[in-house]
Regions:
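Metabolite-binding pocket within alpha/beta catalytic cores that recognizes anionic/polar moieties
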Residues: 1-122
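Active-site rim beta-loop-alpha module in soluble metabolic enzymes
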Residues: 125-170
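Generic hydrophobic/aromatic pocket-lining and core-packing "Φ" positions
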Residues: 66, 165, 181-184
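Zn-dependent metallopeptidase/amidohydrolase metal-coordination segment
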Residues: 178-216
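Non-catalytic positions within long, well-ordered alpha-helices that form the structural scaffold/packing
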Residues: 70-73, 169, 188
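His/Asp/Glu-rich mid-to-C-terminal helical/loop segments that flank catalytic regions of hydrolases
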Residues: 204-243
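Short acidic/polar active-site loop segments enriched in Thr and Asp
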Residues: 75-76, 174, 193
Length: 243
């Protein structure tokens, strides 16, 4: 089974067959999974913010989501994350396969190992095989996808200041968002292959003369939804024979 976790603007899967909802209890809370078959591949789907976009980034129950997917039998997870662009190489509407992260969050529950000493290797947090598969899909579908980018996870829910963005750029950050961590680290703790597609919705704070507009961001997400579904759907097709 393929786990799918989507961010802002993606609240359903077009073409999902045999769709049904299942409540999965975990030690961290219950999670409502949407189960079904997409392009021949069994999938379990979670929209991070809820179907009505009511859960802010710092209140998402990341541990429950990842444990629910693991308990449901997911063998890998593909995720999307809406980002501001720090590196000018990444234009608005760009899809980026994230390969490293920088954690700037605070106050989140970030590990399954609260009561034991465990140091999980984060040298390659995003699965290389999944990233290569996504690039193969992009090539076959004629989609423009950038392979590699450093994602800075800010806490939210506010947007970042220009001073913070300058600091993140100095750290080497290419993208900034609010939801990519601790999801990726939890996947590593579960030994679950995980890949994330960053979608650049806007230049980060202070990098554009135009004021940051939520309406503009939603417009970009609407435009990129079709190629993003093609990318995810193509991956599901290629992974169908695994499960």
């Amino acid at each position: 089974m393929l786990g799918l976790i989507t961010g802002s603007g993606l609240y359903d899967i077009p073409g999902l067959e045999d769709s049904r909802t299942k409540e999965v209890p975990t030690p961290y809370g219950s999670v409502h999974l949407t189960l079904g078959t997409w392009n021949g591949c069994p999938v379990a789907f979670i929209p991070r913010h809820g179907t009505a976009h009511r859960i802010p980034p710092h209140r998402i129950n990341y541990r429950a989501n990842m444990r629910a997917l693991d308990d449901a039998g997911a063998g890998a997870v593909l995720a999307t994350a809406v980002c501001g662009g720090i590196n000018p190489r990444y234009g608005v509407g760009e899809m980026v396969l994230i390969d490293q992260f920088i954690d700037m969050t605070h106050g989140r529950e970030t590990t399954f190992f609260e009561d034991e000493v465990r140091h999980t290797d984060m040298s390659d947090p995003y699965d290389g095989d999944l990233r290569r598969l996504l690039m193969e899909v992009a090539d076959s579908e004629g989609l423009e996808v950038v392979d590699g980018g450093i994602y800075v996870c800010a806490n939210g829910p506010r947007f970042e200041t220009p001073a913070e963005i300058r600091m993140y750029a100095g750290f080497g950050g290419d993208l900034v968002g609010m939801t990519g961590y601790p999801e990726v680290a939890l996947a590593r703790e579960l030994d679950m292959p995980y890949a994330a597609i960053g979608v650049v919705s806007n230049p980060a704070a202070g990098l554009s003369v135009e004021e940051l507009s939520l309406e503009d961001i939603w417009g970009v997400l609407e435009d990129v939804s079709t190629p993003l579904h093609l990318l995810l759907g193509g991956a599901a097709t290629r992974l169908a024979d695994r499960w």
